[in-house]
Amino acid sequence: MVDNVYLGNPNLKKANTKIEFSEENIIEFLKCKDDPVYFAKNYVKIVSLDEGLVPFNLYPFQEKLVNNFHNNRFNICKMPRQTGKSTTVVSYLLHYAIFNDSINIGILANKAKIAMDLLGRLQVAYENLPKWMQQMSRRQPKKVRQNRLEY
C-alpha cells in the first residue's frame, strides 16, 4: 500500500495506480458527473474550525449557486460576505476538474494569499476523495508555491 501513495501522502494515490471499479463505484461516478450538488454533498470534505474535517453540507442557496455554475457558462453573483461562496466555488471547481477533460482552471483573487487559501481548500477536498474518484496524471504537483502548483 505504501508503494501506491504519492510523495508519502496516504490520501493520494500515485499516477497509474490500478484501481478496481466496482459496479457501485461506476454508478456513483456517473451520478457525480451528472450532478455537482450530489458530488458536493456526498464527497466534498471541508475543514471546520470547530469540528475539523467534515462533509460539506450545502444550504439551499449554495445548491442553487452550484446548479447555476453548472448550467450557465457566465454567472454574476451579488451576495453578502461570509456566506460560504468560496467553499461553494471550490466544490464546483473540484467537480469541474475531475469530470471534464483537458481543462485549465485559474484561481484569481484580490490578494495572492486568498488565492493560495482557495487552492489549499481545493487540495484538501481532493485529498479526501475516495481513491477510485481521484484522477491522477503522470505530472502531479509536488508543492504549491507563489500561486502555482509546481511539478
Please give the residue ranges for each predicted region:
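Phosphate/NTP-binding elements of NTP-utilizing enzymes
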Residues: V2-Y151
